[in-house]
Amino acid sequence: SEMCIRDRNYITESGDNPNAFNTSLGLFAQYDTRDVTFNASRGIFIKAEAKWYPEWLGNTRRNFGRFTLTFDFYQKLWKGAIFAYDLYADFTAGTPSWHMYAKMGGMERMRGYYEGRYRDKRLVETQIELRQKIYRRHGVVAWIGGGQVWGTDKFRWDNTLYSFGCGYRFEFKNRMNIRLDYGWGVYGNQNLPWDRKRSSAFLFTASEAF
């Protein structure tokens, strides 16, 4: 829960340190055919990134690696309409500090869950979004997505969480939108009695979620 994440005693009792230093070495590969990076109407974006966090580089009693993959696809449909798809994966090997676990939720993915409500060593999230311009600078969007975090246990479809929502867009500059979203999280993990409450959130920022 949120209380557990912010409670220093909880983190300490779990065997972790609430204060940790993390630095890494890494490399990445990227492929990008989007017409506009911050508000694409067509194209593909792929990014794969691998990082290594060795103890000798100053990490707090840790040696771990992290791999992330992003795949985004954009396609024009009819006049003023754009279909957008996003897939994101985050995998960690070794023993990361609490702060470096993959986090579900936030402003970009699984909107409706606050960032970090669910975290573990492995994460997969995906979403589709329909963006429709309705009049001059005004537009609307709707999305649905799903995701899951897991650790030493295996991936289980019945632990998948879902997010859906809608939003308003105002184009204050050419291809630059103000974003107002309202996202809902479907009921939490039904296998955990403390986690059955529906989550929701208003999100206000500039640029698209992906």
Residue ranges and their predicted role:
Residues 135, 147-151, 173-175, 185-188:
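Short Gly/Pro-enriched loop/turn and capping motifs at secondary-structure junctions
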Residues 2-5:
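Short, small-residue-biased leader/transition segments that mark boundaries at the very start
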Residues 26, 107, 166-180, 196-210:
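Outer-membrane beta-barrel "beta-signal"
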Residues 144-147, 158-163, 182-184:
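Small/polar glycine-rich anion-binding or flexible loop at a beta-alpha turn
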Residues 127-129, 163-169:
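Short glycine-rich, acidic/polar surface loops and turns
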Residues 7-12, 64-67, 100-108, 157-163, ...:
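Flexible, surface-exposed loop regions and adjacent strand-edge segments
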Residues 13-18, 22-30, 34-135, 140-146, ...:
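C-terminal outer-membrane beta-barrel translocator/porin domains of Gram-negative envelope proteins
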Residues 89-105, 178-204:
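Outer-membrane beta-barrel translocator/channel fold
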